[in-house]
Every structure is written in C-alpha cells, then in structure tokens.
Amino acid sequence: MNFNSPISQAQEVGTDEPLRTRSGYKVVEAIKNFKAVLEQSGAQAAGKSLHHTADLVCSGCFFLWQKLLWEYAFDHVGIASPRIFHFLKKRFFEMDGAYTKLPAEQFYRSVEHQKNIAECLLLVRACPRRPPLKMPRVPPETHSGEWVRSSTGTAPPSVAVGRVFRQSHDLAILKRVGDEFAKSCGDGATERALFWMKWLFEEEMYLKKNKEGSLSAMDRGPPGWPAKSRRHVGFYLTAVLAEIYKDLAPKTGMRMHEEFQSLLNLYNFPDKNFTQKRRVDALCLCIQIVCEVPRWKVAAAPSLVTDPLALERAVGHAESFFREVLAFDPPVGNIEKEAKKGTRTTPSVAPMDAKKRKELALQQQLAAYDNMVDNWMGTN
C-alpha cells in the first residue's frame, strides 16, 4: 500500500503563513480535525484519527495530544469505562519517561512508541460513551451561617469522615458537611454529593477571598507543594472518598481498586500536563463511582479490550501512518505556543490573488489526503 502523502511542505506556501504541522495543516485546524474524527465512529474515522495523531505527535505536540485524549475521556466516556483512566495514566507515565530521555526524532521513529501511541488512541475510541456530569448549582445564600446550621447536622456520623477529620486542624463545618457528603454517597445520590463537593470548594474560596483563613490547617496535599495548596479542601475530600471506598468494597463486592486509586492520584498528584479542570473531573468521577457502581449488576469496570486480535491488527498499521508523516521536515517554531492561540481565526481583508491560489491549492491537497485515507480504510 502506498502511504505517500500528496501534501506539499507547509514552508512552500509562504513565510507569512501561520505555523503548520508536518503534514501541512494549520495548527488550530489540526487540533480541530483531530477532535472531530475522535468523536466519529467507523474504520475511516479510525484511520483519520491515526493520521492526525501521528501528525500532532511528530510535530511536537505530544503533550497536547495527551491533553486532548484526557479531554475526550472525561467529556465523552467517564463512568462508562473507568478502566481507561487507569490505562492512560500508566501508559502516559511510561511514554513520558521515554520522551524526556530520547531525542524527539528518535522517539517519533520508534516503532514501539508508535504502537503504544496508537493503542492509547484506539482504546479511547473503542470506549462506550456517556455524557459528562452536570454540576449542580450552589446558590450564594447557601454560604450563610444560618443556612448551614439549618441544612446540616441531620446526617448520622460517618465512620469514614471520623477517620479523616481532625478537630485540632479542621473547622467543625468540615465534619458536618462531610457527614452530609458521606450520606449522599451511601444513598447513591450523585447530584447531592456533587452539590456538597462544590459547596466546600466555594466556601474555601470565599474564606480566602475575605482573608478569613481556610477550612483546614492540615497538610494533606503532596509534599513539596506550598502549604496553602496542601491544605485545600479537595485533599480532605479525596481522603474521605478513599475511606468510603474502603468501607464499600467488601460490603458491595465493588472491584475497581486500581481505577479508583488512579483517579484519586490524578487529583492528588497531577503532572504538569493535567489541567485543574481535569483534576476536578477526576474527583467527580470518584464520587460517581462510590454513588453508582455498588448498584450495578456487576460492580466492576468493563474490560477495555473486547477483541484482542482486531486491536493488534489496527495497532499494526501505526508504523505506516507515522512513516507517512515523518517523510516531511518538522515545523520550525514553537508549535505548542501556536496551538494555545485557540481555534478562532481572523480572516484577512482583501487577500492577494496569489495567496488565495496557494491557500486553495493546499486545501485541495489536504482533501486529497483525506480521500486517500478514506479509500484505504474502506478496503480493510
């Protein structure tokens, strides 16, 4: 099969053009195209997503590609396949180690790493989909002392909260709200548990904004972090969730130990490529697990691989897609900085005819490559 791309080098279009990937896409277009095909099903979409993966990774966007996979996993998979988060965390950690040790081009040309990258992509694509969680609204009036006193204190004392709460370091409200939070988890009331999580986050923010301290003076966060960050209420919640899971697992037969621990670690020990929003998403998914999984018919995470032979065949095509992209020179410039500019583009006013012709020619070449991928995937 011929994987030679008809796309000409981006540098030939003109020096005043935006920075482009190795295959000739504008960076924002490459990201947009990848996100679009990631949400599509079928063999043709899988081929396109492999092409855009190879293009982004080999253009210097390896960490950006990871962020896009995390984004898809949290926004479109979630509780439908908790195993994918454990898998991605482990595989990304392994690949990050190799990426930092090896020269970039050597990493890109390694067949082993190409297959690992393709496997991550294909397994994410194969996951069942579930719409993202909707966060409940927390009205401002709920942060008044009167509302708190009238709305908490009715839940029975939680054993899990009792093992985490420290009277010498934590405000009493953490115990009262913690008991309400634990009761919500035990009742399977996901929305109510998310409400109390969000309430604690907002209460912490209000206290700091008004320079009234914080909800806790206990360092529960990772060593090496600033003291104020280590005392954030989010670490109190992860500790409570860990205790809730320990109590639930033997009672309900829940078997998600690795998945749950990986999600807790994504919040507690995030790497530099994991955004704050995704940390909160990981915490929300932990809440959803303890609320909903005990009520599943089989309280375990579904397997990621349903057809090992089909996955092996698909991963085997990775080398061809990477070879196609690596035939072009790497982009010159900071492509990750270009990617941060966002997807909004400002059309030029009255462009020159010559420039229009070059742009049209490039778009036709990109379309030709897409057709080539379509035709190839249609025969497999």
Model region roles, listed by residue range:
Residues 9, 13, 21-24, 44:
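Amphipathic, alpha-helical segments enriched in basic
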Residues 23, 30-37, 42-55:
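Conserved helicase/translocase motor-coupling segment
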Residues 1-16:
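Short, charge-rich, low-complexity alpha-helical interaction segments
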Residues 14, 19, 48-51, 58-380:
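C-terminal alpha-helical interaction modules of replication/initiation AAA+ assemblies
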